[in-house]
Regions:
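Domain-level signal for soluble alpha/beta catalytic cores
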Residues: 1-215
C-alpha cells in the first residue's frame, strides 16, 4: 500500500473523542498538472499519447488509495491543489504553454479528473479541497482572483468543502463565492502565515461577515 496509509495510521492512533484525524494529499489535478506543463510534456508523451488516458490512470490510482486509506479509518481527506491558483494567475497561459481557450480546456480536464477520483467514495468520507497559493520561504507562488475558476471549481467540483486563501489582495474579493453550489462549506483563509504581524481582530470579523453575503 501507499506509505501515506501508514502515515495516517500513526496520526489516527492519536485521535480522541474531540478530534478527527485528517490526511492531506496532493490533488489529482495537481498531479496531472505537473505532467502536462511545458517542462514535463515531452517526457509524459513518451508514455501517454494524450491527456485522457493519463487522467484515467491517475483517477484509478487515487480511487484505490482512497479505498485503502478509508479502510485504515480515514474519514476526512483533503486535496491540496495549487493548480487552480495557477490557472487564475496573469501568467497562466505561459505556465501551461497555451492560450485562453486552451486554459478553459485544462480547467475542464482538471475538474473531470478530480471528480472521477472522488466518484463512488463512501458517504461518510469527507473530502475537501484546499486551493494552495504557495508558501515557500514565506512567499507566494501565484496571484489572481477566483472569478476565473468559480464556474468550474466552486460550482462543479464534488467536494464537501473548500479551503480558500483570502489573506491579501492577491486573492481578489469574495464575489466568486456566489458560485459555490449545494450545501458545500467554505473555510476562509483570512489570517496569513507569511508574516509575523497579527491581523486586526475586528477586521477579520468584518471580512467574515462580508464573505457571508455571498454564500
Amino acid at each position: 500500500s501507499h506509505p501515506f496509509v501508514e502515515h495516517f495510521k500513526f496520526v489516527k492512533a492519536l485521535e480522541d473523542e474531540n478530534t478527527v484525524a485528517k490526511l492531506t494529499i496532493p490533488a489529482p489535478a495537481q498531479f496531472i498538472e505537473q505532467m502536462i506543463m511545458p517542462f514535463a510534456l515531452e517526457n509524459t508523451r513518451k508514455y501517454y499519447a494524450d491527456n485522457r488516458e493519463l487522467a484515467e490512470d491517475i483517477a484509478a490510482c487515487y480511487k484505490k488509495f482512497i479505498a485503502d486509506v478509508y479502510a485504515a479509518g480515514c474519514r476526512n481527506l483533503q486535496f491540496d491543489d495549487c493548480s487552480w491558483g495557477m490557472l487564475v494567475d496573469p501568467m497562466a497561459c505561459m505556465y501551461f504553454g497555451t492560450d485562453e481557450k486552451g486554459l478553459e480546456t485544462i480547467k475542464e480536464q482538471l475538474l473531470e479528473l478530480n471528480n472521477a477520483a472522488i466518484s463512488g467514495k463512501p458517504d461518510d468520507l469527507v473530502i475537501n479541497t484546499h486551493v494552495c497559493r504557495g508558501n515557500f520561504h514565506s512567499t507566494y507562488a501565484n496571484s489572481g482572483a477566483y472569478d476565473g475558476v468559480a464556474q468550474t471549481l466552486l460550482a462543479r467540483e464534488n467536494v464537501n468543502a473548500y479551503y480558500l486563501e483570502f489573506d491579501d489582495a492577491r486573492s481578489g474579493g469574495f464575489e466568486p463565492l456566489t458560485a459555490v453550489s449545494g450545501d458545500k462549506k467554505v473555510v476562509l483563509g483570512l489570517v496569513t502565515t507569511k508574516r509575523a504581524l497579527l491581523e486586526n481582530k475586528d477586521g477579520v470579523i468584518a471580512r467574515i461577515h462580508e464573505a457571508a453575503k455571498y454564500l
